[in-house]
Amino acid sequence: MTITPQEALQRTIEHREIFHDEMLHLMRLIMRGDMSPVMAAAIITGLRVKKETIGEIAAAATVMREFANHVEVQDNSNFVDIVGTGGDGSHTFNISTASMFVTAAAGAKVAKHGNRGVSSKSGSADVLEALGVNIDLQSDQVAASIAETGMGFMFAPNHHPAMKNIAAVRRELGVRTIFNILGPLTNPAGAPNQLMGVFHPDLVGIQVRVMQRLGAQHVLVVYGKDGMDEVSLGAATLVGELRDGKVHEYEIHPEDFGLQMVSNRTLKVENADESRTMMLGALDNQPSVAREIVTLNAGTALYAANVAESIADGIQLAREAIASGKARAKVDELVRFTQQFKR
């Protein structure tokens, strides 16, 4: 039985759950542009106020995946997405993007799904452009990039065209809604493994269980207790891990891996060019907090990708990838490969 938008709104006002099939129906209306902007705004705000459930988020992500332009990847082994929800307000350089190069250099395949900066001074798309990467690729070109270089960047607007039907509503509302947490759940290449950073501690347990429902294989959802949507050097990090169908939640500390706890203040940047400079310094093996946090996050991603047996092993592989120059070489490789498709 379908639900009308008005009934769904009433449900959110009463703090009652919208069931799976109902949420599928509502989300399809939104993605097709068949729901009025007023009703769409009211429902997504109502969901936020009552707090979205795991079931509601999983259903919404299922529909977003349905409407996406998919990237077909033949070999799913050691295939990982490194992504953050953003919105953590930390204004750091692009740690997950830097980690992509290290993770690929150490033997994983990385499908990075990202956008321009919204809350940050530099989104993943902005810094990749500053590096010289052509981000405007078709789905088959992204697939070729993953096969050839071990990395592919999927610029979100190219892969989620239906999002234009809710873009104006989201912009005018100006508050976080369910759509802020759907991006990391809707990788167009369907990477079965993931390192996902989130902007709130409550989302660690929620997002990892959403990924469990969506059939993911090995996922680590992380929240740095200093507010970062990354594995942090400045505080303990909360982890929700999905492996072999089971969820475990725990805390990790930099000292667990022989790293020094140090403030993330030195990682702040004002724009994409500053982010590019800091990233290249880390990949060039210049001793810095930037290098250490990239090593930590890439090591965690290598564990998520099942290249490493543990985060500690992953960190060792990441160190070797940076020290050998392989990680830095991956930047030039991605630039060269993507520029051939420049239109």
From Swiss-Prot:
Name of one Pfam family that matches: Glycos_trans_3N
EC number: 2.4.2.18
Cofactor or coenzyme needed: Mg(2+)
InterPro entries listed in its UniProt record: Anthranilate_Pribosyl_Tfrase, Glycosyl_Trfase_fam3, Glycosyl_Trfase_fam3_N_dom, Glycosyl_Trfase_fam3_N_dom_sf, Nuc_phospho_transferase
Binding site residues for anthranilate 1: 84, 115
The record's free-text note on cofactor binding: Binds 2 magnesium ions per monomer.
Binding-site list for Mg(2+) 1: 96, 230
Signal peptide: none
Family: Belongs to the anthranilate phosphoribosyltransferase family.
Record-given protein name: Anthranilate phosphoribosyltransferase
Source species: Burkholderia lata (strain ATCC 17760 / DSM 23089 / LMG 22485 / NCIMB 9086 / R18194 / 383)
